[in-house]
Amino acid sequence: MDTKHFLPLDFSTQVNSSSLSSPTGRGSMAAPSLHPSLGPGLGSPLGSPGQLHSPISTLSSPINGMGPPFSVISSPMGPHSMSVPTTPTLGFETGSPQLNSPMNPVSSSEDIKPPLGLNGVLKVPAHPSGNMSSFTKHICAICGDRSSGKHYGVYSCEGCKGFFKRTVRKDLTYTCRDNKDCLIDKRQRNRCQYCRYQKCLAMGMKREAVQEERQRGKDRNENEVESTSSANEDMPVEKILEAELAVEPKTETYVEANMGLNPSSPNDPVTNICQAADKQLFTLVEWAKRIPHFSELPLDDQVILLRAGWNELLIASFSHRSIAVKDGILLATGLHVHRNSAHSAGVGAIFDRVLTELVSKMRDMQMDKTELGCLRAIVLFNPDSKGLSNPAEVEALREKVYASLEAYCKHKYPEQPGRFAKLLLRLPALRSIGLKCLEHLFFFKLIGDTPIDTFLMEMLEAPHQTT
């Protein structure tokens, strides 16, 4: 016969035997006398060596430290001595006389505890049984309403719990209009705040428990602030913003140098975009070197990351720069490319995607330069780039940018809890648009009718570095 099914029974009897058996190994207390529902199966001596061969008996289980088995066999609702204490010195009426009073008709849900005068008839013991202990846990010790658990040391309802917490936290003072002996029950608990608070104290509610709860909340908030600040120290958003601002003057220089040019340049939009991209690739390298920890990576890895992300990095930049432009984009050279020109040049579909999925979304949420810089840093630290010597290191840097950006959003825009997620949702669109733009550039390079300068040509001739 397979004995595995009997392991739980053997284990429980073994645990009970250690508590119930006498030094001679014979059971000094029969299990049926403890609880009739357990049946006669546990009435035999429990010290027989045949029951000690189960492998589970050698394990250190928490149940071995439970002591006598009474807590296991009796009601799980707690110790037998649990009852609602009385405080006659304060003039509060206890449960039973209150139930007997003709002025307080009871509902069916409250008519559970028998009047004290019926103890002899119903054979209610002097000390409450396990069932009575269970009952006291289901009622509020202050007003007799249904208890929601133990609060500040006493089983109480949500109403009395909240009342006591507010009183302690706000350090409120009450006055009784009568003789400081008002009846506090479910129906009248709100009539006298003074007597209700005094009864909370009399029943055992602890002021210090409320204060400790508040301190725990403060400590938790301080820990969160410390964790966010430590993340920001590893990848400070201030440095990321500095990197964005450092390349901005060069963009403005391009704009000033081209102020005399007619915005509708004789060159087609694709040529203008390619020329702007070639110039921006130089500033992109300078930007990347200013991003924290990028220059600490092996030089080969730096090159791989820039080759893998240059197109998305440039698209993110000119999209954010174009927030103030209507139906067009502003290039770093200072030229505007209108959507009509893009459609005429045959790149209208991808141009419209840039406007709707990037420029418009950035405008709607008023994305600032710090957030733009963090998104670009996330693109830069791409652990999926092929050929990296240590992808895990790059992934760790990306995670630090995530943490710093999230902390920045919570601090700068506390009224927008979903802002961090909205920012990250721009990344898939940026990736998709970047790949489509690469397809167009490869096509223009292939047919050869669009002048592509040296740096951009080098980027296009290198194999695409992402998986």
Swiss-Prot record:
Annotated positions binding Zn(2+) 2: C176, C182, C192, C195
Membrane-traversing stretches: none
UniProt keywords, alphabetically: Acetylation, Cytoplasm, DNA-binding, Isopeptide bond, Metal-binding, Mitochondrion, Nucleus, Phosphoprotein, Receptor, Transcription, Transcription regulation, Ubl conjugation, Zinc, Zinc-finger
Residue positions binding all-trans-retinoate: R321, A332
Domain notes: Composed of three domains: a modulating N-terminal or AF1 domain, a DNA-binding domain and a C-terminal ligand-binding or AF2 domain.
Family statement: Belongs to the nuclear hormone receptor family. NR2 subfamily.
Protein's recorded name: Retinoic acid receptor RXR-alpha
